[in-house]
Amino acid sequence: PEMSRGLGDVYKRQTMISTDIGIDLGTASILVYIKGKGVVLKEPSVVAFDRDTNKIKAIGEEARLMLGRTPGNIVAVRPLRQGVISDYTVTEKMLKYFIQKALGKKILKKPRISVCVPSGVTEVEKKAVEDATYQAGAREVAIIEEPIAAAIGAGIDISRPCGNMIVDIGGGTTDIAVISLGGTVVSTSIKIAGDDFDEAIIRYMRKKHNLLIGERTAEDIKIKIGSAYPSAEAVSMDIRGRNLVTGLPKTVTVTSTETEEALKEATAQIVEAIHSVLEKTPPELAADIADRGIVLTGGGSLLQGLEELIEEKTGINTMTAEDPMTAVAIGTGKFIEFLAGER
């Protein structure tokens, strides 16, 4: 029942102000940002469920530990493939779970939620994300494209009439965009990103060293000694895997110079995509970018030497955002404030 709008009511409304939440719905992980608290949750986008009963067994980190280790009736899946919803019902349940987990149980008023999607998604896919978010308990939903979220999170003032180029390298996709006046002017999304770096290392180790390694090991190599550009001093690490000839465990020493060779093809494709976006950029905005530089975000941007490589191939100053992993989540959360400010 509608109460009379007295002072007490105004006070009550103040204390019941709803929460603003930003969700970075990534192929590899999901991050939840809450206004005033920052990023409160970061978990793998994995769901494990029982085939026979269709009941969900685990979500997030708990489910990731089950990947490749489950008995026949339990399957662990990643419902988002290359930034696209491949399984709608599972995604909806996953969203619900993470929203509740991030907020805790005390929700007086439904939250306003903004969700970030890769720039290449179709209207149908956007609608699916929107529906899933409403189903998960949102009062209002705003869908934001990844490059814009990344730009806000990287601290760029996107409302100005000035060209900024953002390159967001995630797990499944790399989004490249030129942004001005709060919108995307030119953009492209390629399905070459962090996951492909790992796969390239696996292929290289097999070809060059006859060594079979798993995804976790490949990611380890990428993080510790992965390189996109020749550096003055090469670093190395010992890798354990299975020798393909003898079938027995073996240790091989790998150097950063080798990882550069392994990753050449994938990094070249990212540079190529940056080129094609620059070629389509209107001259005034291109001049802004030459002046202000290219900003990298996303987990994939942490690859050593990537800035130097892009700089050498484009001739444009390139820098990585302060906290590239969480830039998209933070930007998604702040986007709601940006929208509210425009009303």
Residue ranges and their predicted role:
Residues 9-169, 177-295, 301-343:
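Nucleotide/phosphate-binding catalytic cleft detector across ATP-hydrolyzing
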